[in-house]
Swiss-Prot record:
Organism: Thermotoga neapolitana (strain ATCC 49049 / DSM 4359 / NBRC 107923 / NS-E)
One Gene Ontology term from the biological process aspect of the record: L-tryptophan biosynthetic process
Annotated catalysed reactions: 1-(5-phospho-beta-D-ribosyl)-5-[(5-phospho-beta-D-ribosylamino)methylideneamino]imidazole-4-carboxamide = 5-[(5-phospho-1-deoxy-D-ribulos-1-ylimino)methylamino]-1-(5-phospho-beta-D-ribosyl)imidazole-4-carboxamide
Enzyme class: isomerase
Cell location: Cytoplasm
E.C. number: 5.3.1.16
Record-given protein name: 1-(5-phosphoribosyl)-5-[(5-phosphoribosylamino)methylideneamino] imidazole-4-carboxamide isomerase
PANTHER family found in the cross-reference section: 1-(5-PHOSPHORIBOSYL)-5-[(5-PHOSPHORIBOSYLAMINO)METHYLIDENEAMINO] IMIDAZOLE-4-CARBOXAMIDE ISOMERASE
Gene: hisA
Protein's UniProt keywords contain Ribonucleoprotein: no
Amino acid sequence: MLVIPAIDLYRKKVVRMVKGKKENTIFYEKDPIELVEKLVEEGFSLIHVVDLSRAIEESDENLPVLEKLSSYADHIQIGGGIRILEYAKKLLGMGFRRQIVSSKVLEDPSFLKKLKEIGVNPVFSLDTREGKVAFKGWLDEKDIDPVFLVNRLKEFGLEEIVHTEIEKDGTLKEHDFSLTERIALETGVKVIAAGGISSERSLEEALEVHRRTNGLLKGVIVGRAFLEGTLTVEVMKRYACQENNSVS
């Protein structure tokens, strides 16, 4: 099972936005480059990096940070405001093949195929709030069944998603794996769970779901709990070493 540390960028700083709300932004005195470098040295095969400035404000202010992070592109899945092919190509040119997409895919599912055609490995970000699908930096919602949506996107080549529980994101409350597990079992796509992966108990439950789904629950993303030390690197590594922890 993959255990994936998360780093959100806003105004060139490492942040967490509780429940995805800009007014609830927590800034951390951590250098994102040094943080990624340390995580790679610790042996994490994948790190989740999201450019919130671009996702929410369509700003390129974090681009200099991303350019520096490109040295570790093989260890990073990048997301945030990837809505046009030109920007996806720019990220690909930096070495970021694994790209997280959401809003554009909801508007135009064929965007998944277009990304694959240029060499991107797209992962769909399925962000849910009280059963509804959120998009555009979590500012808008669609009243659509997540399982139906994922099965629909499979027709366009979808193979993997990140499922985030927005109401738990950045709160240190426990993730509810019931919907995550249902999505995995009823669609057959690989799922990475996010939002509320806040304790060793969360990791234990994730590992159980990983086994029940025969590995379809591919892993979990740990954000605030990692940044604040609620989950230590040592504990995260211990769970990452169990079962299959391949990125592909």
